[in-house]
C-alpha cells in the first residue's frame, strides 16, 4: 500500500494520493459529528440527515464535484495555488508530467495531505480531525513551509462552502431553502443561521448554526471575510474564484448576507515566508445548537495550544477504542487489525449512512447491525454493554417480528427506513448469538431474567396486518421471553419444504422477491444452531438454582405444545396463526409458569427437526464434492444445482450449516472443496458470495439484476467470507478458515488495487476496488474470529479459556506470538510459544502460567480473576507442544 505502515499503531502513508481521488477517510466523534475527507479535501460534514454543514457528498460527487474544503495561496503575481489540489491550473496538469504529487498520511483518527508547488517550492500539509472532546467541530490545521531558497510572499485564504440544511434539499427546493439563509460575517469567520427548517408538511423555526472560523498561529483573525457564494465565485468557479483571484474587498464585519448560498471564505494577512520557514493556520468548521453556542465554540477552540492538544487527545482516544493488540509474524496483519477493531465503533456513530458509498437512508442502524456491532464491543468492554443489550430487545414485537431501524438512543426504534412493512426472517437469530457471547464473556446468566418492553406500532400477524393492534398496551417480558418468542415463531413459519420462509429477505437484503414460496435453508440452519444455544443458556440458568421455571404469557403453551405431528408443516403454520391471533386479542396479564427443563427439551427437539429437514432435502452431492442448497425461490425450486456444467452454489448456506452444526465432519471437507472449486477467486479477495445464477430469474430477488461480481451478486462479500472463516475455525478447520480471511485483508492493503485505506470494505468489485468501506458487520466478525478462534481466547461462563488455532507461519522468528486484550475487567497479555512447527490440529497447551504461577488447562476461573490487580497487564504464557496420541 504505497509506503505502508509507519508504526505499530496503524498509522500509514500512501505516496500517490492523487491516484486515489475517490478514496475517502472517516473523521468522527461520539458526540455525533460525522465527516468524510479525500486527498482533495472533498467529502462532507454533518450531524444528522437534517444538519449537513458541508454539501452532502456521494461517490459521484467526489469524482465530478468541485465543492469541498479548500485553502488558497495567492502569490505576488496573482497566481493561485490550492493546498487541496483544486485550482483550475492544477486540475489542468493532471495526467501530464507536471501533475502534482499528493502524499497521504493518516492514523487513528486523523488525516493529512501533503502537496508541494514545485515551481514555488511551497509545501502545504493539511491535517484534519474531529476532536474527541466536546465541540461539534472539524479542525483543519494548515502548515505552509518554504522548501526553496528564495523568500515567498503570499496571501492565504481558507474557503469552505456552508450548506446548512437537510440532505433532502439537494433535490427538494435547493434554491428556495437558500432564501432562508442568514449569514453573519465576523472577525472570527462566518456563522450561518437559517431562519427556518424547510418542510412542506410543516416548516419549523430554526436555531441551529453552521460556521467557519479561523486564526493564524499568532492568534490573528482573517483580514477579510466573504459569506456570499455568488460574490466569492463571481464569474469564475470554485476552482477559480474571482474573490480570491482579484483580492476583492471583504464583507462588513457584523453585516448579514441574506437569502444566498453561503461560503466561509477567510482571507488572512499577506505573509512572508523565508527559506525553511513555516506558518500555521487553523480552521474550524462545524455546527452548534444556536448562534450563542457557535460563539462559545469560537471562544474555546480558537487557540493554537487547545488545537494542538486536541490532536493528541483525539489520537489517544481512538487508540483506546480498540484495546486489542496482536504481535504475529506479519506486522501488516497486526496493523490492519487496529483499523478493523474500530470499525464497529464507526458504525455505531455513522449507522449505515453518511459516508459517500452509503448514500441511502437517513441515519440509524439496522436490527442485525445493532447485535453484530455489539459482538465487537463485547471483546473490549463487555461489562458496559449489558444495559444496551437489554434495551435492544425493546424492538421485538409481540408476534416475534421486530422494528428494523434503530434510533440514536438505546431502546429507540422505527418500523422501517422507508415506512414499508417488511419482515427479515433472520432477525431473531442475531440476539441469541450476541447474548450467548455476552454470557460466555461475563458469566452474567441473570441477564436472561432482566425485563424489556415490546415494540408496538400497530403491525400484527407477523407483519402482514397493519393496525391489527388498535391500542397500545404496556407489555414487558424477560430477555429470555423475547428470545424464546423469536425462536419459536420463526420455527413455526414453515415453507412448503419444511424450511423457514424467506419472507421479505434474510441477511441478504437483495433476496427480496420471494415472499410467498421462498425459503432460506441458510437461516433454517442458523436457527437450528441458535435454538441449541438458547437451550444451553436456559439449562445453565436452571442449574444455578436461580429459578426452575419462567413466567410467560399463557399463549406460549401453543408454541411449546408437542401434540401428534407437532413438527409437521401444517401444524407449525396452524400454531403460528393461533398464537399471533391471540397476541392481538388476549391481554398479556394472563400468564403461566413453564418449567425450564420443558422449554430446553422443546428447543432441542425443534433444532433437531430443522437439522433433519436440511440434511434430507438440501444436500447436493456431486462426483467431486458436495454442499447444501441455501434457498428456494418463489417458484418453490432450489436456487443451487450440482448438475455438471450447470453448477450453482451460494456461500451463505455453507456458512450456517457449518456454524449451526448441521454439516457433519465428513461433509465439511466436501463443502470447502466445492467452495474452493466454484467460488474462490484470490484476485477478487477470496470466496465469492455465489456463482453465476440465472439472471432472468427474478423470483428470488433484485440481486440477480445486479451485474455479476458486484454487491450481493457474486462479489467477495466480506461479511459472509469472514463468517465462513469463523465457521470453519469453530469446527476445527483452522487452515481452511485462514484461507477465507487472509485474501481479504491482503487485498485491502494493496491500495493500488483496492483503492481504499486500511480496514475491510463491505465487498470488492471485480477489479479489486474495495466498496462501501468502514461500515460493515464483517469487522466485528473478523475481530471475533481473530480473538476467539485464531488466538483462542474465549469465555466460558465467565472463565477465560485458551484454545489457540494459530498457524505456524503466524509465529515470529522466535516462535512466539501474542495478544493484548481485556477480559473480566482486567488487562492480559497472552503469549504463545510454539515448541515445534505444528499445525493447530497437532498441538495442545503443554504448560501455562499466569504471572509466573502455573494454571491448569489454560483456564482462569472468575474467582481467580477477581483477585487480580486492575491497574496492571497480567502476563499469561502458554507453551504449545505435540498432542499425545
Residue ranges of predicted features:
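Anionic coordination/interaction segments
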Residues: 1-371, 382-395, 422, 427, ...
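Aromatic-rich carbohydrate-recognition surfaces in CAZymes
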Residues: 72-75, 370, 377-385, 389-496, ...
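Alpha-helix capping and helix-loop boundary segments enriched in small/acidic/polar residues
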Residues: 129-133, 361-365, 380, 415-426, ...
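Beta-rich accessory regions
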Residues: 133-157, 212-233, 275-280, 287, ...
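Conserved H-X4-D acyltransferase segment
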Residues: 142, 366-380, 653-662, 728
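Acidic/histidine-rich catalytic neighborhood
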Residues: 171-175, 185-190, 448-474, 555-586, ...
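Short, glycine/acidic-rich hinge or "gate" loops at secondary-structure transitions
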Residues: 173, 293-296, 405, 445-455, ...
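Extended glycan-interaction surfaces of carbohydrate-active proteins
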Residues: 320-362, 389-410, 479-514, 551-716, ...
